[in-house]
Amino acid sequence: MNNSEGKNFLVDVLKILPDDLDCLIQAPSLENSTIQAMMLDSEFDYFKSIYLDKERKMDFINEDVDHSIGNYIQHIQIRKGVELLFEGFNGVEHGTLSKLVNIPAWFKEKYIPDTCRRSSEW
């Protein structure tokens, strides 16, 4: 995978997901003040919580485009309500999308199956 593909993977995932998302993020070395201001404590050790409405989702995307914040994320879970929609690991270089997510053809061509897979369970 080239660097631009890895950098854009998280951005592209967020673009195909709906707004109003709950994210659990494990990123102990992330020092980006914009993202840190969005983070709240979560009920899970080592994870912070971020709620992404439409505006905050765009802010998050812009921070990743400008500062590659995805590189600092060890583990991310993105949910809509109780449904897990995406789980990513290791700088969000790869991940798994829910079978409930409508995946556009351009995303499939760019990322599936090498960078992203589709869960058959959730």
Can you name each region flagged by the protein language model?
Residues 1-122:
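Structured alpha/beta or helical-core interaction and ligand-binding surfaces enriched in interleaved
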